Curated annotation (Swiss-Prot):
One of its GO terms (cellular component) is cytoplasm. This is Uncharacterized protein C663.15c. One of its GO terms (molecular function) is phosphatidylinositol binding. The keyword Cytoplasm applies. The lineage of its organism: Eukaryota, Fungi, Dikarya, Ascomycota, Taphrinomycotina. It comes from the Eukaryota. It comes from Schizosaccharomyces pombe (strain 972 / ATCC 24843) (Fission yeast).
Amino acid sequence: MDSLTSILLLLELQHEFSGLKVPGRLAKFGPPFRPSEEFADAEDSPVMKMIAQSYIFTPTLPGVNKAPPEFWSDKLQPLLETIGKHNLSDSYDHGRVSKRKMVGFAVVVVLHVLSKGLLGKATPLSEDRKPTSNNEEEDDADEAKSSNADSSTDSVQKSLANVNMDDANGPERLHYPSVKRLREAYSLLVYGDGLQQALDRISVSEDVDSWDEPLRSVIENIRYTIAVILHFSFVTVDAIPESPHLVSNRKGPEGVVERLYNRIPWFLTRQVLRVGNAGLLMSGLTRLFLMKPLSWFGESRNLLQTMLAGIFNADLEHSESTMVETDAEFEDDAKWETMRKALQWFTQLSRTEQDDVRSQSINKELNITIAILEAYEAQQTETTETEGVDKEDSDKASSVQGNEDEVPDTASETEHSEIEDFHFDPYSEKGVHIAMRYFDAALTHRDRECLIHDLCDNDQLNDVVREFMNAFYNIIYEAHQAADFSQAIYDFQYFLWDVIQLSKAGAPLVKFINLVERYQSCFVRFIHRLVVNAPDLCGEWCDWYRHCLKQFSVEVKTPDAVDVAHKALNTLDEETKHQVLEEIGDYVKELDEESKKAIENKDSTSEWLLHLYNFFGSAIITPTTAHGVPQPQLPNCGMKLNRTKEKLLTPFRNLLMEQLNELQAKNQETPSEMTSTE
């Protein structure tokens, strides 16, 4: 797949995933979701729809294939659309990329990797080509093998936070998985018996580090990828300084994860999972997390709702205290009162109205609070003029006398107001910081209230979880008979704790790789017991794995994304085409330069992570002053693909959707033709 197609797929997936917050987009995915008459004109999402139909909504995925259609259309879809209708806040307004948007960026780059495999296909190795390796690759493999030779296969019984991660057994430098070996492994998995080889080996031994190439490179890559994701999410993002006007409430993902960690009843969960009977196990889990206790004071919450509400309430209390402190600081200040009303007014606007104000902020190069203030004052002026015309004739006589009597009071009020207005100036640097701090708290407060209402104050989420557990009952039953769930939860608890401790310490990537290597034995042991003791369950999952791997094969027909990209490019005039190609060429060069810098800094060189860095760093946020150009989250960081998004993305999406519809129509005609022939 060429660079043009790859970049267009990346931009298209960003557009599609960010559009899921708009009601009606999910209904466009087709079955099992129900079409929406209310949002019939919603945009299509061709790439995400194709990924969902290829990997999730298949008859081979265990658990999902047992879920009734009503689960998706009557349970999950209404919950997601309800959250979408509440119009949660945008990162641009906060002045920094939110955790929610950061997770969205991570999902986009993962979907990009899947879409490249689905549309670009894996290239099979030629029969006369023998896998070769240079001395450097062999040395790296030997070093990786020796560094892992001492890793224990016993269960982790204590926290690794107190273990010296710089010991002699830890790698002194990063061992990047060989790209050539990975390509050989992918070809073996897609076109050969790579999956069966892996199953045979893991059924015999838990020592995956003794595997031969190229499958050993797959294990290294999995380990490496998990460590990179953890390091980026918990350290890299947290190390980026926030805007000076924002007051952090335990900033960083580890704050949310630690709050969740502290609210999970680990001991009770392990005790329930020790029950031998699978039916009692499912009943115990349902009672533990979903059963509501009796209450004399209205309807109570179950444990799941209480855990989520506790996480949201921490942000709710912090934002509320910030707003109260700001209001107290500028009590009886006329200009602050106007600004406060304007910010609260904006939080209650519809999505379209908020987008209009946001566009004014970008086009006029204004801070979002100034744009909101101007829009609010214009709306108030229009309302006042309308009301004044209606009352002008009836109040004319009385207003003259009233004005004469009230002249001294008006003058004194004006003088008093001017004195107070001196304390808060919305256009000053300090005023913008104060307004942004209050605005960030107001948006957070509204978001958390909406999430608490959707997830904790009604039973929609409970119904989704209950149906999900019913669909996976057989899987949980067989897995419970084959492996020790209680020990698995114990290992995961301490792994999560160590991730939190490393995150607080701002540990480098190497320590996260060491951490994943040390806990690798826990995960491999669990998989080993499932393969050995639950062959039927293992066979079901392997059928799905083979189905997924087959999608990367050239035998499976999918839209020709490269052809679509070049057809879309040819719809542009020569000048625009040259500009688009120049943008994409510059971006590819920047990726190469960033990869070289990453090697020098002992950081990850994965293409998907570089895309993730660029997504995060180039996200546009409101300027920090009253007048200024909107800036990216990180200085001098920008994807610089605006022309490509503006001119080429829509033709690419439309042509891709046409090919996808034609391919689906052919697939539907083929079974009917076979039936008529018979």
